[in-house]
Swiss-Prot record:
Gene3D superfamilies given in the database record: 1.10.287.100, Transcription factor IIA (TFIIA), beta-barrel domain
UniProt biased composition (Acidic residues): 401-416
Family named by the database record: Belongs to the TFIIA subunit 1 family.
Name of the protein described by the UniProt record: TFIIA-alpha and beta-like factor
Biased composition (Polar residues): 380-391
Lineage: Eukaryota, Metazoa, Chordata, Craniata, Vertebrata
PANTHER family: TFIIA-ALPHA AND BETA-LIKE FACTOR, TRANSCRIPTION INITIATION FACTOR IIA SUBUNIT 1
Any one Pfam family match given in the protein's UniProt record, by short name: TFIIA
Gene Ontology BP terms: cognition; transcription initiation at RNA polymerase II promoter
Length: 468
């Protein structure tokens, strides 16, 4: 059972219903019928461009053949330079440039939906027998089972005298599930009336370049044999003008433009020789930048070092000498300050004696033996006094009677204190006034803090009642 796609019919029915529904409104407002038709056509075009459906508004699956009759006065330079780019896996009726130059020549094309560029002065005949003569360059395509002429503007450059014409046609790669949808989309072509650009690459094997670019040249008169690694094939005389570009933004490039090809050829990616001095210079600069990033070296310092090596060495020596001097002075200061008392004293009596001897020997001409004897006597007397004072203090502490602690005779004992605060609700405040009526009490409190139910409250005024 054949699969029937109902989505296009659904879209078409919705569009027709809406157009019929607003037809009366357009008539009441005085809008012309052509505006409504243009609206419907625009709607259908938008749905088609959105790729919401496949085979949208396709009435026939037959592909009529389009016969092109080349005139006798057509310049012979057109045929050997004509080129087409078609996807791999498709076949094209073979014909040679010699066949195109014959008097009664014709070519049949069976590409439905693909536009064909027809230059001025050419006549073409459809399968129905209608003959059309072209006076200006046009684009011919076939959609919905009929042949249409699209006069879209395309780029033209004035042709130089005696130069061949280059026509380039690009066709997108077709997925099996979107083959019919892709045939509906018309691709614009650019006819560039200028000589093909001349590439100036270094001496490189042409066969090697073609294999690297995944292109295969097709000889005239032979059927296309697609290559698995390359999705596109080229015919003889193919040109890559710099202005050639796809006008559909949604399509991927068919082949690289001549600029990128020229860049690849000039960069010589196929050469196997040793790298040049520029390559070595780049490697050295990259290694130097890597070292700078590792060691934290500044690029400006490196530049300054390269420009002024002698001054930098002198400044480095001065900085090094100043740093050594500062370190030496700091070490001397640390060695002079020695802890000789307190808990951090780790020096022995011999070290202390040597330090005192060094201090006393600093001024040998001022301090004599008599002065030293007087100092020793004063030290001995002070030591005896301190010993006597310490012994008197110890005797006084032993003979002093023990006294009772303060508040020892209070009525409240220590055991009764916890009972006073054996409650969860505590109020600390000031009493404003208290009223009593028999066993009822009423309290007026102010400026207090209350802990009630495990939560703390601060209040300015409070009233409480109690019975007991």
């Amino acid at each position: 059972m054949a699969f029937i796609n109902l989505v296009p019919k659904l879209y078409q029915s919705v569009i027709e219903d809406v157009i019929e529904g607003v037809r009366d409104l357009f008539a009441e407002e005085g809008i012309e019928e052509q505006v409504l038709k243009d609206l419907k056509k625009l709607w259908e075009t938008k749905v088609l461009q959105s790729k919401a459906t496949e085979d949208f508004f396709r009435n026939s699956t037959q592909v009529p053949l389009l016969t092109l009759q080349l005139p006798h006065a057509l310049p012979p330079a057109l045929q050997p330079e004509a080129s087409l780019l078609i996807p791999a896996g498709r076949t094209l009726p073979s014909f040679t440039p010699e066949d195109l130059n014959t008097a009664n020549c014709g070519a049949n094309f069976a590409f439905a939906g693909y536009p064909i560029h027809v230059p001025a002065g050419m006549a073409f005949q459809t399968a129905s027998g209608h003959l059309y003569k072209v006076n200006v360059p046009v684009m011919v395509t076939q959609t919905s089972g009929r042949t249409e002429i699209l006069q879209h503007p395309f780029q033209q450059v004035l042709q130089q005298l005696g130069q061949p014409l280059v026509i380039q046609t690009t066709v997108p790669t077709l997925h099996p599930c979107s083959l019919q949808a892709a045939t509906e989309k018309s691709l614009r072509m650019e006819a560039v009336l200028q000589p093909p650009p001349i590439l100036h690459p270094p001496p490189v094997d042409r066969t090697h370049v073609e294999n690297a670019a995944s292109d295969r040249r097709l000889l005239p008169g032979n059927e296309l044999r697609p290559q698995e690694s390359s999705p596109y094939l080229s015919l003889p005389g193919v040109g890559f003008p710099p202005q050639a570009a796809l006008t559909e933004s949604s399509l991927e490039p068919v082949l690289g433009v001549s600029a990128s090809l020229t860049q690849n050829l000039h960069s010589d990616p196929f050469s196997q020789g040793p790298p040049g001095p520029l390559h070595h210079h780049l490697l050295e600069s990259q290694l130097q930048s890597l070292k700078d990033s590792i060691y934290g070296c500044d690029s400006t310092k490196q530049l300054r070092k390269a420009e002024e090596p002698s001054s930098l060495r002198v400044s480095e020596k001065n900085c090094t000498s100043e740093r050594d001097l500062n370190i030496r002075v700091t070490d001397d200061d640390i060695n002079e300050i020695i802890q000789i008392d307190g808990t951090g004293d780790n020096s022995s009596t011999e070290e202390m004696g040597s330090i005192r001897d060094a201090d006393e020997n600093e001024f040998p001409g001022i301090i004599d033996a008599g002065d030293l004897n007087v100092l020793e006597e004063v030290d001995s007397v002070s030591n005896e006094d301190s010993t006597a004072n310490s012994s008197d203090n110890e005797d006084h502490q032993i003979n002093a009677p023990e006294e009772d602690p303060l508040n020892s005779g209070d009525d409240v004992s220590e055991q009764d204190v916890p009972d006073l605060f054996d409650t969860e609700n505590v109020i600390v405040c000031q009493y404003d006034k208290i009223h009593r009526s028999k066993n009822r009490w009423k309290f007026y409190l102010k400026d207090g803090v209350m802990c009630f139910g495990g939560r703390d409250y601060v209040f300015a005024k409070a009233i409480g009642e109690a019975e007991w």
